[in-house]
Every structure is written in structure tokens, then in C-alpha cells.
A protein has these predicted regions:
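Cofactor-binding active-site loop characterized by glycine-rich and histidine/acidic residues
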Residues: 50-53, 57-193
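Asp/Glu-centered strand-loop micro-motifs enriched in Gly/Pro and often flanked by an aromatic residue
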Residues: 30-32, 65
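Charged, compositionally biased N-terminal leader segments and the immediate start
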Residues: 1-30
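Positively charged, low-complexity intrinsically disordered leader regions
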Residues: 36, 40-41
Length: 194
């Protein structure tokens, strides 16, 4: 986490470079990561990996019908969760973001309830497994069609900007999303209207 006094200025004349041509570190700022904060980030990443492993067991034992493995995504997901303000900012996730959901504060009981379509699921089992959402945390319910959440994310971000709410919209997606029309529609809408 970069300290507030060391944030980057967007749209500078020179490109912002943190790594040199030979791979050397060029960044001249301290990170605000020490002690308990580092332990909390590590715990959240470990919990995300363990959740992913449990989901894999559920599919292999036939207890659920769909999973989207996310091993290796933990650091990015936990970083997003700790960089935003849960319940104020908005997250538009894709189906591999169960670690992000957990780190934001969606209870394990709800995540497993959603995965197994039990009464612990806020949607009462009416949503496909691995598609959680949380109204309280502004965690947009995951949609199955790849990239279909990008246009709503762009629209939400533009409305936040116009209304000057101070909120942020975060949209995550995999590389396959960039081959979809919805992705291009959302990116174009954000570029033209944003």
C-alpha cells in the first residue's frame, strides 16, 4: 500500500516507471506495509487459497456442479479488498473472485451456502455456484456470461463521477473477457463518457 503522500499523479508528461530497462527498482517511495498489516494480508491470501482448495474438494466429491479455480490470484484479490472501502466503493467481480469476496467480508457461511445452494445463501440457491454477491458490501453479483459485468461497471463509475460521490468502481476479469463484445462496449463507454 502506497502512503497517501506518495501517490502517483495521473497523466504526467513522462511515463511513470518503477522498473528500469535492466529490471532494477526505480521507485523512490516507502510502502505502508508493516507488522500487523502484513500479517493480515498474508492471512487473507492464505484463507483465499484454502477456500479455493475446499471448493476443489466439493467439485471432486460431486457436492457442487461448478467451480472456477483461482489459485495464484490471491495477492491481486486481497490487494483490491484492502485498497477499497467495503460497502462504499463498488466491486464488479468475475467468477474466479471468491478470494476477493472473502477478503471484503462476505462470510464463509454465505460463500459455502451459495456454492452448495443452501438456505445460508442470500440468493436461496437461485444463482449458479461460484456466483456470490453482497448488497451490503456493494459486491455486484457475479454473472456467467464472460465480460457481461464490464458495461455495468463502466456505467456505475460514470454515474459516481457525475454525482461526485467519491466512490470507486473496481471491475475484474480474466484474459478471455478481452475477446468479448461486452468488454469492448464497456471500455468504449467508459472512454467516451468517462
Amino acid at each position: 500500500m502506497v502512503k497517501e503522500t506518495h501517490r502517483f499523479e495521473p497523466f504526467t508528461e513522462e511515463p511513470i516507471r518503477l522498473i528500469g530497462e535492466e529490471g532494477e527498482w526505480l521507485g523512490d517511495f516507502p510502502l505502508d506495509l508493516e507488522g500487523e498489516k502484513l500479517r493480515r494480508l498474508y492471512r487473507d491470501m492464505l484463507a483465499a487459497r484454502m477456500l479455493d482448495e475446499r471448493y476443489t474438494i466439493l467439485i471432486r466429491t460431486g457436492k457442487t456442479s461448478f467451480i472456477a479455480p483461482a489459485a495464484g490470484h490471491e495477492a491481486a484479490q486481497v490487494a483490491i479488498a484492502h485498497a477499497i472501502r467495503p460497502g462504499f466503493d463498488w466491486v464488479f467481480p468475475y467468477y474466479r473472485d471468491h478470494g476477493l469476496a472473502l477478503a471484503l467480508g462476505i462470510p464463509l457461511k454465505e460463500l459455502f451456502g451459495q456454492m452448495l445452494a443452501t438456505k445460508a445463501d442470500p440468493n436461496k440457491g437461485r444463482q449458479m455456484p461460484e456466483h456470490p454477491g453482497s448488497k451490503a458490501l456493494n459486491f455486484f453479483t457475479v454473472a456467467s456470461p464472460i465480460a457481461s459485468h464490464v458495461p455495468p461497471a463502466a456505467g456505475a463509475a460514470i454515474s459516481m463521477k457525475l454525482l461526485r460521490t467519491g466512490q470507486v468502481a473496481v471491475c475484474t476479469f480474466g484474459d478471455g473477457a478481452t475477446s468479448e463484445g461486452d468488454w469492448y462496449a464497456g471500455i468504449n463507454f467508459a472512454a467516451v463518457q468517462g
